[in-house]
Amino acid sequence: MDMSPTPEFPASLEWLNLSKPLRMGQLRGRVTALVFFNVGSAWCQQRLSDLATLRKRYGEHLHVVAIHVPRFDHERDPKRVLKRLQRVPLDFPIAHDADWVLWQHYVIDAWPTVVL
């Protein structure tokens, strides 16, 4: 595993529910869970729901950033992803990593994966 400092979020990420891109520097010193998920997976939907519950329980002591990584071509459309996600109320930033940049940096090999 690469133990280098946490990289800045790549410019290629599309933030689905933020007006301005999130910067990794905004999270420094905070307990943060990066969850790599796929919108088409029921297992991933459950993990997102679990993390939303933990956010409610721990408030500002736990930050969550969800990173959607498409598995199929139709999941590359961020509008479709956002539409699917509106079924579950989530109060944390959601990014669309269409090019798998963060997935590759963290050497992720399965959905869902949570990195603290």
Model-derived segments and their meaning:
Residues Q45-V88, A98-Q104:
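Structural microenvironment flanking redox-active thiols in thiol-disulfide oxidoreductases
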